[in-house]
Every structure is written in structure tokens, then in C-alpha cells.
């Protein structure tokens, strides 16, 4: 029987030197305030440093992440993880489906391609009341949850690097010569 491994947090590598990029969409200011508060509190509790950048809406988040992550890598000060925050509330047209789906897909593509831990805190809801409940730190705290997700994957990435120096986390295909042996 396989026993799932639960992360207690106590054996996590230190995240004190981690640089976390937080990109927030402020289309709904009151919701954005709560999402950001939850995320920055979680990041501060981990000892990591947050850099917050604001964009108008959810579709601007992935392109902003791509631009800033690339610039940070070129500068020699790469981000260790990203947290995306925003809110998309269903309206009367199909715009909701495009914004919700495309922003999530683009963020996942970036995360996998760059092997960059990313917490997606873009709420996709039917009503403003649902958004408020999910955003509020005192209720569902989805901003904090997105930050915790990014930090957990970062801790996993660092633990893997410590256990296997010189090897990156993720899939590495075998070369033909290795499989012939």
C-alpha cells in the first residue's frame, strides 16, 4: 500500500532568501485588497520577500509574469516563485470563459516551461458574493492559499536540489545510449 506523504512544514528548507513575484489584477479593488493581504501575509510568515506588481486585469497577468521573470533572470536576480492574484466574475457573455481559461492555461504553461513554482489565485466565480467569501482572509483566504501553494512547490524544488545536487526537478528523458546499456 502506498502511503501519501504529507508535508508538515517543519522539514521544509528555509525560504528566507526566496524572492516571490506577486502579480495582482485590480479589476475589483476590494477583492484584490483581500487577495493581496492573504498572499503577502503567507509570504511574510515563510520568511520570503514579496515583490508586488499590479496590472489591470487577469489576462495581463501571464504576459507580465513572462516579462518580469525573464528580466529578473537576465539581471541575475531571478524570482523563486510567482503568485497570481485576480478575479473573474461571470457576466452575460462568453468573455468570462476566455479570460478564466486562457489566463489559467498561460500561467500553467509558464510554470511548467520555466519550472517555476506558481500559485494561481485568480478567482473564477459566478457572483461577487462568492468572490468576496473566497478572497477574505477571515473566510476562505484564497490569496493566502495561492501563496502557500507556490511556497510548498518551492520548498519541494529546494529539497530536491539539496538531495540531488546538479539535478533539476522534473522529467529528464533518458538518452538512447543510457537505455542501450
Curated annotation (Swiss-Prot):
Record NCBIfam families: lumazine-synth
Annotated binding of 5-amino-6-(D-ribitylamino)uracil, by residue: 27, 58-60, 87-89, 120
GO molecular function, one term: 6,7-dimethyl-8-ribityllumazine synthase activity
Organism whose genome encodes this protein: Methylobacterium nodulans (strain LMG 21967 / CNCM I-2342 / ORS 2060)
Protein name: 6,7-dimethyl-8-ribityllumazine synthase
Family the entry assigns: Belongs to the DMRL synthase family.
Reactions listed under catalytic activity: (2S)-2-hydroxy-3-oxobutyl phosphate + 5-amino-6-(D-ribitylamino)uracil = 6,7-dimethyl-8-(1-D-ribityl)lumazine + phosphate + 2 H2O + H(+)
InterPro entries reported for this sequence: LS, LS/RS, LS/RS_sf
GO process terms (BP): riboflavin biosynthetic process
EC number: 2.5.1.78
GO cellular component: cytosol; riboflavin synthase complex
Pfam families per the UniProt record, alphabetical: DMRL_synthase (PF00885)
Record's keyword terms, sorted: Riboflavin biosynthesis, Transferase
Active site: 95
Domain of life the protein comes from: Bacteria
HAMAP family assigned: Lumazine_synth
Pathway: Cofactor biosynthesis; riboflavin biosynthesis; riboflavin from 2-hydroxy-3-oxobutyl phosphate and 5-amino-6-(D-ribitylamino)uracil: step 1/2
Physiological role: Catalyzes the formation of 6,7-dimethyl-8-ribityllumazine by condensation of 5-amino-6-(D-ribitylamino)uracil with 3,4-dihydroxy-2-butanone 4-phosphate. This is the penultimate step in the biosynthesis of riboflavin.
Binding positions for (2S)-2-hydroxy-3-oxobutyl phosphate per the UniProt entry: 92-93, 134
